[in-house]
């Protein structure tokens, strides 16, 4: 004997179609909201990126502007100092002669000297007998490292000196400008 099917509650076909349409509209609405939020996040990220790029460019511009302003101040101070200094005519003439001599030597195609064959042979013998590059390599590497460290220290010292000189020149220029300005009137 077969058992009859169990009764289930079913919705009328008109409600099923309407419910399905509402569900589809709701899902479309959710998808649209998700896309809107995603687009909003993308726009916000792009705006933040452009703001960061703009701020970087602004900082670089301000840094370059400050450097140029300091250079202009230093140039103005140099011009003011040069205006008060008398140049030595003998030094200028000697420098012109030295430049002309160097120009003629560099412009000529003549070889400066011809090597003596005996000197070349003696040098080759010296290289073959006494020159030991492997033994000197460790010493040269150590000296190179010391020279590199000294160079770094020297660069640091030069940077500090340049900064100090620049600050001194700026202060001197400010004092010079204050001295050149007419005195301020005070109302008592």
Curated annotation (Swiss-Prot):
Q: Which residues form a coiled coil?
A: 141-163
Q: Which GO terms describe its cellular component?
A: cytoplasm; HAUS complex; microtubule; spindle
| GO BP field | cell division; mitotic spindle assembly; mitotic spindle organization; mitotic spindle-templated microtubule nucleation; regulation of mitotic nuclear division
Q: Domain of life here? A: Eukaryota
Indicate yes or no for the key word Zinc: no
Write the record's keywords in alphabetical order, separated by commas.
Cell cycle, Cell division, Coiled coil, Cytoplasm, Cytoskeleton, Microtubule, Mitosis
Q: What is its main location?
A: cytoplasm
Compartments reported by the entry: Cytoplasm, Cytoskeleton, Spindle
Assembly and interaction partners: Component of the augmin complex composed of dgt2, dgt3, dgt4, dgt5, dgt6, msd1, msd5 and wac. The complex interacts directly or indirectly with microtubules and is required for centrosome-independent generation of spindle microtubules.
Instruction: Give the protein's biological function.
Output: As part of the augmin complex, plays a role in centrosome-independent generation of spindle microtubules. The complex is required for mitotic spindle assembly through its involvement in localizing gamma-tubulin to spindle microtubules.
Further details from the record: The name 'dim gamma-tubulin 4' derives from the decreased gamma-tubulin staining of the spindle pole seen following RNAi-mediated knockdown of dgt4 in S2 cells.
Could you identify this protein by its name?
Answer: Augmin complex subunit dgt4
Q: Which organism is it from?
A: Drosophila melanogaster
List the taxonomic lineage: Eukaryota, Metazoa, Ecdysozoa, Arthropoda, Hexapoda
Encoding gene per record: dgt4
């Amino acid at each position: 004997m077969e058992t009859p099917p169990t009764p289930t509650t079913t919705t009328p076909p008109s409600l099923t179609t309407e419910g399905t349409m509402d569900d589809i509209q709701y899902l479309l609405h959710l998808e649209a909201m998700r896309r809107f939020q995603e687009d909003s996040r993308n726009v916000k990220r792009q705006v933040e990126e452009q703001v960061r790029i703009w701020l970087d460019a602004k900082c670089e511009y301000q840094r370059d502007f400050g450097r140029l302003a300091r250079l202009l101040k230093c140039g103005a101070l140099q011009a003011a100092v040069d205006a008060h200094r008398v140049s030595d005519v003998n030094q200028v003439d000697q420098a012109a002669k030295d430049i002309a001599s160097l120009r003629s030597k560099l412009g000529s195609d003549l070889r400066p000297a011809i090597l003596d064959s005996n000197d070349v042979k003696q040098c080759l013998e010296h290289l073959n007998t006494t020159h030991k590059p492997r033994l000197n390599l460790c010493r040269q590497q150590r000296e190179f490292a010391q020279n590199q460290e000294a160079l770094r220290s020297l660069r640091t010292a030069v940077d500090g000196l340049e900064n100090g000189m620049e600050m001194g020149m700026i202060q001197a220029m400010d004092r010079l400008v204050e001295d050149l300005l007419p005195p301020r009137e005070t109302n008592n």
